From Swiss-Prot:
An example molecular function term from Gene Ontology annotations: antifreeze activity
Spans through the membrane: none
Native source organism of the sequence: Myzopsetta ferruginea
Tissue: Detected in blood serum (at protein level).
Signal sequence, start to end: 1-23
Descriptive protein name: Ice-structuring protein
């Protein structure tokens, strides 16, 4: 019997989710046995992970701010060019008569 596209889609999603879960296991699940074995090392790893997350967030914020600044500069340049073109057109119309 033929499987419906919906069922095929569900199976693909299931296997895709399982593959991602196996490739990137839950950090909390990995940290629990490590915390029992060596609490100091587990705490240091948690601090390092938090620091890397903070650094990634800061980098993303800086990138967003740079993009916003570039977009603002581009919009200002376009507005200035449009204003200059309108002024030149008005001057030409005045000179014609």
């Amino acid at each position: 019997m033929a499987l419906s596209l919906f069922t095929v889609g569900q199976l693909i999603f299931l296997f895709w989710t399982l593959r991602i879960t196996e490739a990137n296991p839950d950090p909390a699940a990995k940290a629990a046995p490590a915390a029992v074995a060596d609490p100091a090392a587990a705490a240091a790893a948690a601090v390092a992970d938090t620091a890397s997350d903070a650094a990634a967030a800061a980098a993303a914020t800086a990138a967003a701010a740079a993009k916003a600044a570039a977009d603002t500069a581009a919009a200002a340049a376009k507005a200035a060019a449009d204003t200059a073109a309108a002024a030149a057109e008005a001057a030409a119309a005045t000179a014609r008569g």
